């Protein structure tokens, strides 16, 4: 699982930090090939995902800015490297807030040019955990250059990478 910095280890860490118990309903926003969805399901969560170009089991076509789901419908959301790609980070946080039940948790990691914390707070979230993971982004980027799969040369050196665990109370 190398579709995002830190791979499966980072996904497991986010899940642990969320405090969500197995059986909770979790939607992966920007699920891609569904690797994180598969991990969540293996850990006992009721998990599915959406992506503009779905490529995995339990991943449906959908736009994270306009999710076809009821408000307050999920215990948890996870998004790794997807809000930035949506083109509208504030709208992505607002949509995530709408989707979560009261007491729900958003697990978020992404590239950032400015801190996401104030954007998440403006959407209504309480920040429960924050970590600057820019060193992990640099390692991931260098590895992608080495493999010849880096397609984001325009952003190198100008961005960071951060993790937020956000609650909806």
Descriptions of predicted regions:
Residues 76-88:
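A short SAM/SAH-binding and catalytic strip from SAM-dependent methyltransferases
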Residues 4-22:
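Conserved alpha-helix/loop element of class I SAM-dependent methyltransferases that forms part
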Residues 114-123:
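Short alpha-helix
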Residues 132-169:
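Conserved Class I S-adenosyl-L-methionine
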Residues 27-66:
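Class I SAM-dependent methyltransferase SAM/SAH-binding core
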Residues 90-105:
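A short glycine-rich, Lys/Arg-flanked "PGG" loop and its adjoining helix->strand segment in the class I
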Residues 65-77:
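A short acidic, Gly/Pro-enriched loop at the edge of an enzyme's catalytic core
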């Amino acid at each position: 699982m190398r579709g995002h910095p830190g791979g499966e280890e980072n996904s497991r860490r986010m899940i642990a930090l969320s405090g969500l118990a197995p059986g909770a309903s979790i939607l992966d926003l920007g699920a891609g090939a569904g690797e994180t969805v598969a991990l969540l399901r293996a850990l006992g969560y009721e998990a599915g995902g959406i992506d503009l170009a779905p490529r995995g089991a339990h991943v449906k076509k959908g736009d994270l800015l306009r999710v076809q789901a009821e408000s307050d419908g999920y215990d948890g959301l996870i998004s790794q490297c997807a809000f930035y790609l949506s083109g509208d980070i504030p709208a992505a946080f607002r949509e995530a807030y709408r989707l979560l039940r009261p007491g729900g948790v958003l697990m978020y990691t992404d590239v950032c040019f400015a801190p996401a914390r104030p954007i998440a707070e403006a959407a209504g979230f309480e920040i429960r955990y924050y970590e600057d993971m820019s060193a992990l982004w640099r390692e991931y980027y260098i590895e992608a250059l080495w493999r010849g799969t880096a397609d984001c040369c325009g952003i190198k050196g100008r961005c960071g990478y951060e993790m937020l665990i956000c609650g909806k109370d």
